[in-house]
């Protein structure tokens, strides 16, 4: 940390110190010697001047006045003489006495100059002659009308700025001879047609939109942040806080406004409830859910301190009242839709093992390589019977319905054998399996480190 030195204050001059400390007798010796010229240098000059005399050279301890005769200028420029402006004659001020006329003549009397023009000469003595006429015909001016028709138009404007109150009147129709022009100003109305209004909805369900274009979705309103560090949390147990909170702050007064608005109070010394002491404002209520219950909350402002300027300082308090708890949702045990005796292992496919016996005409035996049963499956054909053995990873017993008997065409028994076309026909396969059938390609996929031979023996499978 850098230490800052104090600013050096200027010391008073010796003259100022001598004026203040001479009378008190506390002046330092150097100040007295400097002011009274008693220093060592002053004494040497005083002693030396007693024995030396330099004449009129002006060398001494006194002021430099140049001796008795003064300094002699060595060589200077001559002074320049400035011409003075001529003096103006004084203005004579004439005094006006009480007997002098108050009218001041602007132009002095002067002689009249004759320009040479002759003066008019009047010879008559009877005055002016008046001439009268006895004609009684009025003077009529002959005005020839111009060619063309005269157009007279009238226009009506409505300005709401100069109408009190501003109203809209029916405009007057403007007429022009020969032409009809109907014009309506912007602020007016034109010829209208009365259309009776009809009621489209009489009884509603309560779900109608309140605007023409309702906003899709829901708008989440931000919840009040009542659980901050700036708010003091106070729990209220009196149920009067819900309906008449003012009775907890001051004396009951029926003039108070509705309890759903912000209530203001004057600071009082004593409150019926000590938790509401120094409360000057109680804001609007709010219902919130917290920790499994419905809570009624209000924010209050206290006026604990008051400054000289009139500003009130106090804490903000969050008053809450727990109305009722929210019951937990009952957990309903899920019941299986199928009976318990139907146990299925793994996924359902066409090779699923069904315990229920069904009347089948034949059974297909499927076994693993370690266990190869030799069950035969008699398939209904008209000419021959084929035995099929399919080794798979697990033993399943799948019922297969063979369908109707189809007589296949056969060739002659004599040699050479000539096959007839078509040799075989497509047969219907009806398998009562589960919800889906797995594509056989997925059974033939090879997996690592598991070598199981998949093969079909004894020809093809037909059903």
From Swiss-Prot:
Disulfide pairings: 21-27
Organismal lineage: Viruses, Monodnaviria, Shotokuvirae, Cossaviricota, Papovaviricetes
Pfam family, one: Late_protein_L2
Record InterPro entries: Late_L2 (IPR000784)
Gene: L2
BP terms from Gene Ontology: microtubule-dependent intracellular transport of viral material towards nucleus; symbiont entry into host cell; viral penetration into host nucleus
GO molecular function, one term: structural molecule activity
Compartment annotation: Virion; Host nucleus; Host early endosome; Host Golgi apparatus
Keyword tags: Capsid protein, Cytoplasmic inwards viral transport, Disulfide bond, DNA-binding, Host endosome, Host Golgi apparatus, Host nucleus, Host-virus interaction, Late protein, Microtubular inwards viral transport, Phosphoprotein, Viral penetration into host nucleus, Virion, Virus entry into host cell
The keyword Disulfide bond belongs to this UniProt entry's keyword annotation: yes
Complexes and interactors: Interacts with major capsid protein L1. Interacts with E2; this interaction inhibits E2 transcriptional activity but not the DNA replication function E2. Interacts with host GADD45GIP1. Interacts with host HSPA8; this interaction is required for L2 nuclear translocation. Interacts with host importins KPNB2 and KPNB3. Forms a complex with importin alpha2-beta1 heterodimers via interaction with the importin alpha2 adapter. Interacts with host DYNLT1; this interaction is essential for virus intracellular transport during entry.
Similarity comment: family membership: Belongs to the papillomaviridae L2 protein family.
Protein name: Minor capsid protein L2
Cellular component GO terms held in the UniProt record: host cell; host cell endosome; host cell Golgi apparatus; host cell nucleus; viral capsid
HAMAP family for the chain: PPV_L2
Record bears the keyword Disulfide bond: yes
Biological source species: Human papillomavirus 30
Job of this protein: Minor protein of the capsid that localizes along the inner surface of the virion, within the central cavities beneath the L1 pentamers. Plays a role in capsid stabilization through interaction with the major capsid protein L1. Once the virion enters the host cell, L2 escorts the genomic DNA into the nucleus by promoting escape from the endosomal compartments and traffic through the host Golgi network.
Residues spanned by motif Nuclear localization signal: 1-12, 444-452
PTM section of the record: Highly phosphorylated.
